[in-house]
Amino acid sequence: MRGTEWREARDRVAEMFRKAGIALTPSELEKVEVADFGLGNLAVQGLQLVTYINTDRYCAKELALFPHQTCPEHLHPPVGGDPGKMETFRCRWGKVFLYVEGEPAASVQAAVPPGSEAYYTVFHEIVLTPGEQYTIPPGTKHWFQGGPEGAIVSEFSSTSRDEFDIFTDPKVERMPVIEFDD
């Protein structure tokens, strides 16, 4: 990902948080993580994150999804003696379509990214609007997509070890690489 794309995404995130009435400090805005998952199409498969804290006991983040942007299917595996990350998603703004293991929805509201259909395998649908939340157990495959306006989701979890996430799509690279051009 180019530095200009990161800056544009960060600026969009800042505007989304302003519209949602969620304050971020200048320091937090400078540290927005923009993940295109190495797939090169941030608008379709990507995620923007602000990590408030991540210790060996707990983690708190904000996840920002642009309209119809999808975080690819993945799970949080056991690491050492830890059973894997347990996380609660609480929608703060917009709408998010969350898909987990379980009985598939008769009609899925989100759109699986074209060309990636083979890598989306769970379709138990949870739709979150502001104030609603859902807890994802450790080791559970899941993926999520922003609604028509996008979404801001607060994540409360056990320790986050994103570098160990297992994605269904083997092309995904979880840790973003940014090439600054200035």
UniProtKB/Swiss-Prot annotation:
Mn(2+) binds at H74, H76, E87, H142. Its cofactor is Mn(2+). Keywords: Carbohydrate metabolism, Isomerase, Manganese, Metal-binding. Its EC number is 5.3.1.15. One of its GO terms (biological process) is carbohydrate metabolic process. It comes from the Bacteria. It catalyses: D-lyxose = D-xylulose. Optimum pH is 6.5. GO terms for molecular function: D-lyxose ketol-isomerase activity; manganese ion binding. Optimum temperature is 70 degrees Celsius. Belongs to the D-lyxose ketol-isomerase family. Sugar isomerase that catalyzes the reversible isomerization of D-lyxose to D-xylulose. Shows weak activity with D-mannose and L-ribose. Homodimer. This is D-lyxose ketol-isomerase. It comes from Cohnella laeviribosi.
